[in-house]
């Protein structure tokens, strides 16, 4: 008993660490997401628009198209991207591992459901949420919980649903809410069930004594920050440039090209899984393409797959999840988008 008491006294719980983490979360999200989106909701209600399509007016030169899109894209997301990397590194050194294991570490459906719930305040795009999901996996969060958090950020974004209701109509927002929730929970649950967790079990988080031997909080955080940055950001930038060059072929804006057929439902579902966009950018994209003649069914497919995953975000998570899990996630999201669009054809 005396030995146990002395051990507990030697390593008291440091409340300032989770307190600091949640302070960064609240201040960061207020500055990057909550406060800007509050004003944007009034703009959407008054004008029934949140801006131009980020895909429109692509340069015919692929190199110029890649550069132009990268500039527009990164100007839109850089604050959220910085916040995502910051939170993804801080969660590894400030949040006790047992907290995450008790909530998101379970392989049962409870962990997946909690991951979806915890994603709601984040409102991040799939690429900005990816570093946070990678940090969660370093803390041994289950695949289901981390995937639900990652996909829930863009698909269940409350602000996006409000924008969508004012711009595209509340029927679109309702379909997005129901289908988005079903997609997040179904995909995360199936990946958790079908992919062996032990294949790439995350490295165990060291105990208090091991942490002490690795240095103080600041040095451990800098190591986590650098590792996360190096594993995610360079490939992120490269993938955005490549997709920027290909955008004109992925999403044709010519009048009447994308009609209301099963072929285009499947094509848009797949294209949406490949491309990368900022938060809520699917709304003006779909609005512009529908004005050019795109049918409702392909539009619904895009509204599910375009925000949910992208090639850059999947690549960013290549060291956090088994390759099979990422391929399966992309395929299942495309299938969910195709099913939602196909139901609109019935």
Where do the protein language model's features map onto the residues?
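Interfacial loop-to-helix junctions that mark the boundaries of transmembrane helices
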Residues: 10-14, 67-75, 170-179, 226-230, ...
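Membrane-interacting alpha-helical segments
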Residues: 60, 64-71, 75, 114, ...
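Alpha-helical transmembrane segments in multi-pass membrane proteins
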Residues: 76, 80, 84, 88, ...
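Alpha-helical transmembrane segments of multipass membrane proteins
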Residues: 88, 92, 183-191, 243, ...
């Amino acid at each position: 008993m005396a030995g146990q008491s002395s051990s507990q006294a030697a390593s008291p719980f440091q409340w300032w660490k989770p307190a600091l983490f949640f302070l960064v979360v609240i201040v960061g999200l207020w500055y990057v997401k909550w406060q800007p989106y509050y004003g944007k909701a009034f703009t959407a209600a008054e004008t029934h628009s949140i801006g131009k399509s980020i895909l429109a007016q692509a340069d015919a030169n692929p190199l110029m198209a890649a550069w132009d899109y990268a500039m527009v894209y990164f100007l839109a997301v850089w604050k959220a991207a910085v916040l995502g990397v910051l939170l993804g590194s801080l969660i590894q050194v400030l949040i006790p591992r047992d907290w995450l294991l008790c909530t998101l570490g379970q392989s049962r459906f409870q962990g997946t459901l909690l991951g979806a719930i915890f994603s709601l305040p984040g409102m991040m795009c799939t690429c900005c949420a990816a570093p946070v999901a990678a940090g969660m996996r370093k803390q041994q969060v289950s695949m289901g919980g981390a995937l639900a958090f990652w996909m829930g950020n863009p698909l269940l974004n409350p602000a996006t649903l409000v924008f969508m209701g004012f711009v595209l109509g509340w029927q679109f927002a309702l379909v997005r809410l129901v289908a988005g929730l079903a997609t997040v929970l179904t995909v995360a649950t199936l990946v958790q069930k079908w992919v062996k967790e032990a294949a790439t079990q995350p490295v165990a988080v060291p105990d208090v004594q091991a942490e002490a031997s690795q240095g103080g909080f600041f040095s451990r955080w800098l190591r986590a920050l650098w590792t996360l940055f190096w594993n995610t950001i360079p490939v992120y930038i490269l993938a955005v440039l490549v997709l920027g060059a290909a955008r004109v072929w992925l999403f044709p804006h010519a009048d009447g090209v994308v009609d209301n057929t099963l072929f285009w439902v499947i094509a848009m579902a797949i294209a949406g899984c490949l491309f990368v966009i900022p938060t809520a950018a699917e709304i003006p994209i779909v609005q512009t393409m529908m004005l050019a003649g795109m049918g409702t069914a392909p539009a619904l497919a895009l509204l599910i797959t375009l925000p949910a995953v992208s090639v850059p975000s999947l690549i960013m998570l290549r060291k956090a999840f088994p390759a099979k899990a990422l391929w399966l996630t992309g395929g299942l999201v495309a299938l969910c988008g195709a099913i939602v669009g196909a139901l609109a054809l019935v």
